[in-house]
Curated annotation (Swiss-Prot):
Sequence intervals crossing the membrane: none
GO molecular function, a single term: ATP binding
Domain Kinesin motor residues, every copy: 262-592
Region called Disordered, residue ranges: 79-98
Name of the featured protein: Kinesin-like protein KIF2C
Length: 730
């Protein structure tokens, strides 16, 4: 049966096929393979041509009309195969029909055969004539399908001719003869026409394929022109650009409402700087909405296939590279200014990697090495303080405004408004933290504050890092204090934190760098825990773990305490690790899940940033990384050694200060000898007393110095252990 159906399957025939997903659509037969009982079909999908191989059985199952056409009887006369000998055609015509033709027809046929009918045959029409009264279904099939093989036509013609009823012979005889007369001479031309149509169709399909290939090649060339292949990591840049094309971004603007939070965590992305542009780095950070940040982390599979891992983080507010300092201030620090007039304590932090824009955000715009201090958060807050001070609801309070500006470097406090004098942090009898010797300067306008900012910024400690030749290596804190007489009414602390990338330099060969990294890490961890304790209303706040949190203790304790953190992000490809560390740090401060964020972009593939959210009580280094137990033990040993060094250093400095403070007694003793009638016995007694006291101090100082040296050796060994662990893990 399949062989019979195969006779109807010819090249160019339009059939229906079923895809693997169950979809049925039309396709054209391009070739027939009788040995494998299959056909090759081709169809157009979109702008591409596709094809597949289908068995005869599958074709019959989807196209049952082919089988019906083979089995059904028909009285339609089809075109006869062309023959070279016209007399043989007449013979076949008579034997196939088995119906005696009238004399006129016979005479006509004989006349045609004798008079050289070849020329007449070429002039006849090649149209096909069908008897619609007899088999309308088969006529419809013939009209829809493509021309069939010549052998098939002859076989079907014979089968149909034998089934003509004898009773219908007088009526059909003349009609059949006419059909035979018209079909037989046109057989040669029909065959040529069928072949030419198939060839034309194949050529048309070939031309379409060539055009499609040319179009695809042009697209590839155009796509290659869009990306500079000389740029490092251009493949990642291409993937990021294609991903961003699917996003529906909604940037934050000044028209959006400013929500008030007790703890507000925001993220700001800066644009690529000149150094990154010169290196042709790609931008790996996207801000699709006002509270979502995406990091396109470049990854490599085992087979070195490049792909992106898109990590999503949610915060209260997210600012892209187009946001100005004024926009950032409106949603971060501005809501906190009014709280200090109501007797509250507010704190605003700028956190992030060196070169991410912390000082730019807090201090103001840079033009070369000069800074415009009137365009930073410091200046905006100062203006709003004096604006609120003149309002009637606060004017009757008769408040005075004071400013302090200090820095914390290596756990030590220095006054930036008093020639960088070293300060001591102590607790008084009321268990309130006092910065002994900190200079508070009264100001009467915002311009006075600007001058203080310029003076303090010029004295701030800086150092060189891989990101910046002159990087701030200390935490700078500007405090705007409101006093009503001598009583504290409110305080706003604006803190520009040190770069967090030095927190991983605890294994450096340079002791100063190790100390910097350890102190920065210590203060940042303690700061995070204090903010979390404030947000979760914990009974214990670990503010004693660092000098920074110790000084800002009153900002973490109390119902009127409010905090805002601005996490600064560097978008460059080479800053991906530090950027993720910054985002994880900010995420753990408030722990907002990105899955709960409201966004209109359904195509965002947001993944949980991961990591444990367990609270860290005490000091653990490298909070930005998940450490194994043995690694954590090594870091704890280093931290213990570092704490011991700090304690012994403070002890030795105090003893030395005590020794220097007794220096006037020795001066007085010396001046006694210059008098002509001084009491020698009294001189001896005072000298012996001072020597004994000095001996005690010197012995104690000597012991402290020896202990400090041993502690430094222990710290050195602990640092080497960390270095070995890192090398073994690589």
């Amino acid at each position: 049966m399949e062989r019979l159906v195969a006779t109807r399957l010819v090249t160019g025939l339009a059939v229906k096929i079923m895809r693997s997903n169950g979809v049925i659509h039309n396709a054209n037969i391009t070739s027939v393979n009788m040995d494998r009982s299959s056909v090759n079909v081709e169809w157009k999908e979109g702008e591409a041509n596709k094809g597949k191989e289908i068995s005869f059985a599958d074709v019959i199952s989807v196209n049952p009309e082919l089988l019906d056409a083979v089995l059904a009887p028909t009285n339609v006369k089809e075109n006869m195969p062309p023959q070279r000998n016209v007399s043989s055609q007449n013979h076949k015509r008579k034997t196939i029909s088995k119906i005696p033709a009238p004399k006129e027809v016979a005479a006509k046929n004989s006349l045609l055969s004798e008079s050289g009918a070849q020329s007449v045959l070429r002039e006849r029409s090649t149209r096909m004539t069908a008897i619609h009264e007899t088999l309308p279904y088969e006529n419809e099939m013939e009209a829809e399908s493509t021309p069939l093989p010549i052998q098939q036509n002859s076989v079907q013609a014979r089968s149909r001719s034998t089934k003509v009823s004898i009773a219908e012979e007088p009526r059909l005889q003349t009609r059949i003869s006419e059909i035979v007369e018209e079909s037989l001479p046109s057989g040669r031309n029909n065959q040529g026409r069928r072949k030419s149509n198939i060839v034309k169709e194949m050529e048309k399909m070939k031309n379409k394929r060539e055009e499609q290939r040319a179009q695809n090649y042009e697209r590839r060339m155009k796509r290659a022109q869009d990306y500079d292949t000389s740029v490092p990591n251009w493949e990642f840049g291409k993937m990021i650009k294609e991903f961003r094309a699917t996003m529906d971004c909604h940037r934050i603007s000044m028209a959006d409402p400013a929500e008030e939070h007790r703890i507000c965590v925001c993220v700001r992305k800066r644009p690529l700087n000149k150094q990154e542009l010169s290196k042709k780095e790609i931008d790996i950070i996207s801000v699709p909405s006002k509270n979502i940040v995406l990091v396109h982390e470049p990854k490599l599979k085992v087979d070195l296939t490049k792909y992106l891992e898109n990590q999503a983080f949610r915060f209260d507010f997210s600012f892209d590279e187009t946001a100005t300092n004024e926009v950032v201030y409106r949603f971060t620090a501005r809501p906190l200014v009014q709280s200090i007039f109501e007797g509250g304590k507010a704190t605003c932090f700028a956190y992030g990697q060196t070169g991410s824009g912390k000082t730019h955000t807090m201090g103001g715009d840079f033009s070369g090495k000069s800074q415009n201090v009137s365009k930073g958060v410091y200046a905006f807050a100062s203006r709003d303080v004096f604006l609120l001070l003149d309002q009637p609801r606060y004017k009757h309070l008769d408040l005075d405004v004071f400013v302090t500006f200090f820095e914390i470097y290596n756990g030590k406090v220095f006054d930036l408004l008093n020639k960088k004098t070293k300060l001591r942090v102590l607790e008084d009898a009321k268990q309130e933290v006092q910065v002994v010797g900190l200079l508070e300067k009264q100001v009467i306008s915002a311009d006075d504050v600007f001058k203080m900012i310029e003076i303090g910024s010029a004295c701030r400690t800086s150092g060189q890092t891989f990101a910046n030749t002159s990087s701030s290596r200390s935490h700078a804190c500007l405090q705007i204090i409101l006093r009503r007489g001598s009583k504290l009414h409110g305080k706003f602390s604006l803190v520009d934190l040190a770069g967090n990338e030095r927190g991983v330099d605890t294994a450096s060969a340079d002791r100063i760098t190790r100390m910097e990294g350890a102190e920065i890490n210590r203060s940042l961890l303690a700061l995070k825990e204090c903010i979390r304790a404030l947000g979760q209303n914990k009974s214990h706040t670990p503010f004693r773990e660092s000098k920074l949190t110790q000084i800002l203790r009153d900002s973490f304790i109390g119902e009127n305490s409010r905090t805002c953190m601005i996490a600064m992000l560097s978008p460059g490809f080479n800053s991906c690790e530090y950027t993720l560390n910054t985002l994880r740090y900010a995420d753990r401060v408030k722990e907002l899940s990105p899955q709960n964020a409201e966004t209109n972009d359904d195509n965002l593939q947001m993944e949980d940033s991961g990591g444990s959210h367990a609270s860290i009580e005490g000091l653990q280094l490298q909070d930005d990384f998940l450490l194994k137990d043995e690694e954590l033990s090594t870091h704890n040993s280093f931290q213990d050694a570092l704490n011991r060094v700090g304690e012994l250093e403070d002890k030795a400095v105090d003893e030395l200060r005590e020794l220097v403070q007794k220096e006037p007694e020795w001066t007085n003793l010396l001046q006694m000898t210059e008098q002509p009638d001084y009491d020698l016995e009294n001189f001896v007694m005072q000298a012996e007393y001072l020597i004994q006291e000095r001996s005690k101090v010197l012995i104690a100082l000597g012991d402290s110095i020896n202990s400090l040296r041993l502690a430094l050796q222990v710290e050195e060994q602990a640092s080497k252990q960390i270095s070995k662990k890192k090398r073994s893990n690589k």
